[in-house]
Amino acid sequence: MNIWLSMLTTTGLGAIIGGFTNHLAIKMLFRPHRPMYIGKFQVPFTPGLIPKRRDELAVQLGKMVVEHLLTPEGIGKKLTNEEFQKGLIHWAQVEVDKVITNEQSLRHMLGKWDVAHVEKEATEKIEQVITEKIQAFLEEYYTYTWEQALPHSVHEKIENAIPNVSAFILKRAIHFFESEEGKSRLSKMIDDFFASRGALLNLVGMFLGNVSVVDRVQPEVIKFLGQDGTKQLLTDVLQKEWEKLKGRDVKELETFVEKEMIVSSILSAVKVEETVSKFLNQSVKQVCEPVRETIIEKVVPKAVTKGLKWGGENVESILNNLHLAEIVQQEVSTFSTERLEDLVLSITKNELKMITYLGALLGGMIGIVQGLLLLFLK
């Protein structure tokens, strides 16, 4: 009975010692958090292993992440994974659709993104571009003649319109001279004519009488204006003037209208500020609705695919520029010892318990062996 009690005692003591030793060893990985002193002498094994080697641990963790976890090969493989690409495209389509179907105005969205000043900048930029384009256009066309500047189709239209213009002018002239105003004007012209020709013509005028002269001249003037020959004559005159105009430089226009006035007139007609304001007052949905399907079905998938392809080709350069090892090192270095302990324990809690239990098991087995040795020795 005493033998079995001795074996039980040695086994129990071995298990307790083994379990406690392993438990103490695990605790000594983290504790104490700070070095302890007796007088001027530092107590051995203080601070614990991890607090003591925290800086080295941070460096090694950074290297481990870069060299073994977030490797260019691993990330590149993930980026080219078909399922990953499909999932990312679907996510991007959903997120982009939320943005382009927003009922808020563009102005409100710009204000939310703290870029409300874009309205003023856009107006100024558009006006600047229009001004530069007009000035460049005028600089180029001022070196041409009208014949060179105007398209061939315009030449044809003008030349075809000349006979119609002649007919219109003569028609309006006939209508004018048939009116009382025209007759009165013709009468005044006759009076002025006779007045400028001296006494003899005045005598003829007095003899014939002014009214009779007007009455005789008016039908003849109207008859003259209505003749085909008159129309042809006016057409020929206009045609000659048109030919002269075609040979003249466009730059002569600057004599009558300055460039700045042309630019100012066009900008006033375009109303850039008002146009930009109206555009920004529209909702995002209104602006994007016509191209919504194209954006979702074509633009987004193509953009994501190209982005992933570029990322896969440049992943090593990206990782190098991110300096991940330094980031991990800096983050771990900022952890308090308590947080670092909690982090490690949260990951290895079960395994560390098993190590404690294993120590107790081994201690118990050693106790059994000791008890058997004592039994045989007796």
Swiss-Prot record:
Belongs to the UPF0754 family. This is UPF0754 membrane protein BCE33L0760. Keywords: Cell membrane, Membrane, Transmembrane, Transmembrane helix. It is found in: Cell membrane. Pfam families: DUF445. Signal peptide: none annotated. GO terms for cellular component: plasma membrane. It comes from the Bacteria. InterPro entries: DUF445 (IPR007383), UCP032178 (IPR016991). The keyword Translocase does not apply. The chain crosses the membrane at residues 1-21, 357-377. It is a multi-pass membrane protein. It comes from Bacillus cereus (strain ZK / E33L).
